[in-house]
């Protein structure tokens, strides 16, 4: 435990008064942190500490906390001196009690939670609630004012920070990166975000690498490598590292104040040069960063039971445990708490003394009250173009072909154009914007890029609003940071590789879910995914690129958070895009193809269909509104195509068969209404799918997903699903469907298998379909492409009337 009694300025940047007040603030934050971890009662130690004052289960992380509060205190000083606009991202989010402590000292916590007042009773509640049933979580969760990053799963702090800084020219995002977190892949990639930050337009990110030396039970790499290697590493990333190292509080305060002043001066100079034309034209600045080396568990017990604790991994969580069994630990805890001299920090009522309160900035300059950290306060609706202005015109279903995502790209181009002044919309992706056919956006913007631009480069520019880096983690982190600070965006990615961010998706979904229970958290714009180059269009890249399972990851989350859309054509894709860009506090997953494909619905019909999310396609059905013999359902663009091709075969071969075609755009409509707000009631579901007729369901993804969504439905036993069965290779597009049994011929066979009255035609027609499958196999192995009747198929023509191609 450190002795704070000899704090003196000793000729540094800080005066004696400044140093005293800064250190008092830090001591108060540390005291409040320990109190949250340990205490149920006696918050100010106004009586001897007894076992009944201590929580029965000790939860929390002390090791990182004093460093987090040390940084927080010094950032407060910088904000006050410069009237700066700063938010704090806590990479080591397990230091949650430190973040709560600082927001309490700033007064924000009590303003938002009036029952936890700044007095002794409020402090008692503050301590009791931490990591306690009915209380608050242990990390920097949404209930912590000023937090936009929980930091439970490590690796995303820096990408969140840069996302927050984009298009926020007056904002400085201080991002504390723990040295454990710095070992993760996502964090390593995120250091390159400085190649995309434009000081003329964007805010600044100040990374603060906190080297306290240890993870849970191991040393950290960056804390052990030589300093010249560490300096070279970050210089290679394009940063100017500024170092602060030590353990003695007075000296560390002076060093940190000096270095932080230097960092803010450099940030101001970079911005001024970029915005006044005095910087090197088009050059990327060398942004400052701070490397803070301080002991893990700083100011805590130096030893416990004769074993080193401060400055070692033993301080990571709870340095003193087993208090009921070891009275010496209880005594040591009391001494530790008293070492901060709480009687100097809190007045008779239990409130922080005036000098500590004055150390914090005021109003929205407080990091815990900055509106950028509650982005819903700043969110403004996007200006959106008219749907009909971008619609694919068609006289009848299947009359024309279009590239669905290219049509979406023209819509997004106009979203960019209409919101150019607001600068609140961006597209991110891992070098797949053009590949996914969204290239029309480059008519109005470029790819953001702060490195050298060569004469032969295309669509690169300093002002570009499309951000591309081949790290899905960084893309997701940028977009989350952008959304969390009140803006809008879209993540475009290959379907198979979006799995790289499965866990980030989970964390964001949990954040949104928790925010719903916090009244002061205002809704933010939804996280929107476009997944293209999907499983049925990856025949050229092969098995590694074929995976529709992200839908299943999404469906694991709470119903009120997640939406999954499978538009069958361009006009329905436009309707879905228009809708998701107007939603908030959701995660919307859109799966759509990019090759030229048949278009089915006019814009007016697409609007009606998408509004319902599901519906009967009367023009493809043969039941004439009567009870059908079979329901042929489809979800996804390729399943829809194959279903309609199968319907066409059946209409010719079994003309009296009553077929009802049901198309699903909004996958969540299949769930019962009591499980999802978009779900159909049982009566509505039965009206579409019947209570007892066979349903042949062609689905984009894994078949069991449909069974999972419909298992409570009346007719579930009659639902027979065809989808992706993990069969793939490099082959032809149609062969991908054949390998997985999703093709038209297998679908026809399913109808024959499950419609009882077709027994008379079953054998001959099934054999005909088997012959077609054999013919298909022989043809592709001979010619390397699909049969002409597949390539030239059209809705409404005789299946045998497709034009023949020469061999």
From Swiss-Prot:
GO terms for molecular function: aldehyde-lyase activity. Keywords: Lyase, Thiamine pyrophosphate. The keyword Lyase applies. One of its GO terms (biological process) is carbohydrate metabolic process. Its EC number is 4.1.2.-. Transmembrane segments: none annotated. SUPFAM superfamilies: Thiamin diphosphate-binding fold (THDP-binding). Its cofactor is thiamine diphosphate. This is Probable phosphoketolase.
């Amino acid at each position: 435990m450190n002795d704070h009694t000899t704090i003196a300025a000793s000729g540094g940047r800080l005066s004696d008064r400044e140093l005293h007040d800064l250190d008092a603030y830090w001591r108060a934050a540390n005291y409040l942190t320990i109190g949250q971890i340990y205490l149920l009662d006696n918050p100010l130690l106004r009586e001897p500490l007894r076992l009944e004052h201590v929580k029965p289960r000790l939860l929390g992380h002390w090791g990182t906390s004093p460093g987090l509060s040390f940084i927080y205190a010094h950032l407060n000083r910088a904000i006050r001196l410069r009237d700066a606009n700063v938010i704090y991202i806590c990479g080591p989010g397990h230091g949650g009690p430190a973040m709560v402590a600082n927001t309490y000292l700033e007064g924000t916590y009590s303003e938002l939670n009036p029952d936890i007042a700044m007095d002794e009773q409020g402090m008692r509640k503050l301590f009791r609630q931490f990591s306690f049933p009915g209380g608050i979580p242990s990390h920097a969760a949404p209930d912590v004012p000023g937090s936009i990053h929980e930091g439970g799963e490590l690796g995303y702090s820096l990408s969140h920070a840069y996302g927050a800084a984009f298009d926020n020219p007056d904002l400085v995002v201080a991002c504390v990166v723990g040295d454990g977190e710095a070992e993760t892949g996502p964090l390593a990639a995120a250091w390159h975000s400085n190649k995309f930050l434009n000081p003329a337009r964007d805010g600044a990110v100040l990374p603060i690498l906190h080297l306290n030396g240890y993870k849970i039970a191991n040393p950290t790499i960056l804390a052990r490598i030589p300093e010249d290697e560490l300096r070279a590493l970050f210089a290679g990333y394009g940063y100017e590292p500024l170092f602060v190292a030590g353990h003695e509080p007075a000296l560390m305060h002076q060093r940190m104040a000096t270095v932080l002043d230097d960092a803010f001066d450099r940030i101001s100079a970079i911005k001024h040069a970029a915005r006044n034309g005095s910087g090197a034209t088009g050059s990327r600045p060398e942004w400052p960063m701070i490397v803070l080396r301080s002991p893990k568990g700083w100011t805590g017990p130096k030893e416990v039971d004769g074993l080193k604790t401060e400055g070692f991994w033993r301080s990571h969580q709870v340095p003193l445990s087993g208090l009921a069994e070891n009275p010496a630990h209880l005594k040591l805890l009391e001494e530790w708490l008293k070492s901060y001299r709480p009687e100097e920090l809190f007045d008779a009522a239990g409130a922080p003394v005036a000098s500590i309160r004055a150390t914090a900035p005021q109003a929205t300059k407080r990091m815990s009250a900055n509106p950028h950290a509650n982005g819903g306060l700043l969110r403004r609706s996007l200006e959106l173009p008219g749907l009909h202005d971008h619609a694919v015109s068609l006289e009848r279903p299947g009359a024309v072909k279009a590239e669905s995502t290219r049509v979406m790209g023209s819509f997004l181009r106009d979203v960019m154009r209409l919101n150019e002044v607001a600068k609140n919309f961006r597209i991110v992706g891992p070098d797949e914007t053009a590949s996914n056919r969204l290239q029309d956006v480059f008519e109005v913007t470029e790819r953001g890029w702060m490195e050298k631009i060569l004469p032969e480069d295309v669509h690169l520019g300093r002002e570009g609003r499309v951000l591309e880096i081949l790290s899905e983690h960084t893309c997701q982190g940028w977009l989350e940071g952008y959304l969390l600070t009140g803006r809008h965006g879209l993540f475009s990615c290959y379907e198979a590789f979006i799995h790289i961010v499965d866990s980030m998706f989970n964390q964001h979904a949990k954040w949104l879910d928790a925010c719903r229970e916090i009244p002061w958290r205002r809704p933010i714009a939804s996280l929107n995914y476009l997944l293209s180059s999907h499983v049925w269009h990856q025949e050229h890249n092969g098995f590694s690129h074929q995976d529709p399972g992200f839908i299943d990851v999404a469906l694991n989350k709470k119903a009120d958070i997640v939406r999954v859309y499978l538009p069958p054509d361009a006009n329905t894709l436009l309707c879905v895009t228009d809708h998701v860009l107007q939603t908030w506090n959701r995660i919307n997953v859109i799966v759509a193809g990019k090759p030229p494909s048949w278009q089915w619905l006019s814009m007016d019909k697409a609007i009606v269909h998408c509004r319902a999310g599901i519906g009967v396609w009367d023009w493809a059905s043969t039941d004439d509104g009567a009870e059908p013999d079979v329901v042929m359902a489809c979800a996804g663009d390729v399943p829809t195509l194959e279903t309609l091709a199968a319907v066409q075969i059946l209409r010719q071969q079994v003309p009296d068969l009553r077929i009802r075609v049901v198309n699903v755009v909004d996958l969540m409509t299949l769930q019962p209404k009591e499980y999802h707000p978009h779900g159909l009631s049982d009566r509505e579901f039965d009206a579409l799918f019947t209570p007892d007729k066979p349903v042949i369901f062609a689905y984009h993804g894994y078949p069991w997903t449909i069974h999972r969504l419909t298992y409570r439905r009346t007719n579930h036993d009659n639902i027979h699903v065809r989808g992706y069965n993990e069969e793939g290779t490099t082959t032809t597009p149609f062969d991908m469907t054949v390998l997985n049994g999703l093709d038209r011929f297998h679908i026809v066979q399913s109808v024959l298998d499950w419609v009882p009255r077709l027994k008379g035609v079953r054998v001959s027609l099934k054999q005909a379909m088997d012959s077609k499958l054999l013919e298909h196999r022989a043809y592709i192995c001979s010619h390397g492409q699909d049969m002409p009747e597949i390539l030239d198929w059209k809705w409404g023509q005789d299946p045998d009337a497709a034009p023949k191609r020469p061999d």
